[in-house]
């Protein structure tokens, strides 16, 4: 559910001494390309409120500060289409309208394409998603163009229906492994000379039990407990 709600909150960050406020409908348009050695390129988008870290880390003289999230290539444009189609809304739906909806009907409820071929044209014109692009393939793979039925009467909001659709594909099988990557870019001055430090972290899971997420969350706590 966290990734669905990530498209619900606005984002704030500092850029050249100016506070930038990105509304949630534009968050996934505001992404940059970031290369992680040995793992390729990722898309980075602003994540919620970066301004809170200025006081937390005593960075009162900092001119730019942005905290973000990295996703695989092709994620941001696809998720931007999902958000701006109203699929992450938490407001209550009309139960009768949603009864026996197909996955395609659900995705298309606000796009209002006349057919799946018409949808390809609209996605291209409105969201810059070509029918042969990785973004289109991501949407298709997730099941959003399927004729499978979802009983909308079981859910109260679009985000609940979306979660029910995505959970079939967005799970790890026995032999799947997850990946966590981190990227820090720090630009600073010493003796009026600008310098830059870039650091990377990448951790792979072993399987769908001993995941990269469990390592990064569990190991620091385990080390702390041992030290105490």
What name fits each language-model region?
Residues 1-228:
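C-terminal catalytic/substrate-binding lobe primarily of soluble NAD(P)-dependent oxidoreductases
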């Amino acid at each position: 559910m966290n990734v669905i709600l990530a498209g619900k909150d606005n984002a704030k960050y500092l850029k050249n001494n100016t506070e930038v406020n990105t509304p949630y409908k534009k968050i996934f348009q505001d992404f940059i390309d970031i290369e992680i050695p040995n793992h390729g390129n990722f898309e980075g988008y602003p994540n919620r409120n970066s301004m809170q870290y200025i006081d937390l880390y005593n960075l009162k003289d900092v001119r730019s500060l942005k905290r973000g999230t990295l996703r695989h290539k092709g994620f941001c444009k696809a998720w931007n289409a999902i958000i701006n189609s109203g699929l992450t809304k938490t407001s209550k739906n009309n139960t009768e309208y949603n009864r026996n909806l197909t996955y395609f009907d659900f995705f298309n409820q606000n796009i209002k394409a006349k057919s799946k071929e018409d949808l390809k044209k609209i996605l291209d014109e409105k969201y810059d998603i070509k029918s042969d692009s990785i973004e289109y393939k991501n949407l298709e793979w997730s099941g959003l163009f399927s004729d499978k039925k979802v009983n909308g009467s079981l859910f109260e909001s679009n985000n609940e229906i979306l979660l029910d659709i995505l959970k079939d594909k967005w799970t790890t099988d026995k032999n799947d492994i997850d990946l966590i990557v981190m990227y820090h870019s720090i630009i600073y001055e010493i003796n009026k000379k600008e310098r830059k430090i870039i650091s990377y972290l990448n951790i792979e899971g072993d399987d769908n039990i001993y995941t990269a997420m469990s390592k990064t969350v569990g190991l620091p706590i385990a080390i702390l407990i041992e030290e105490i």
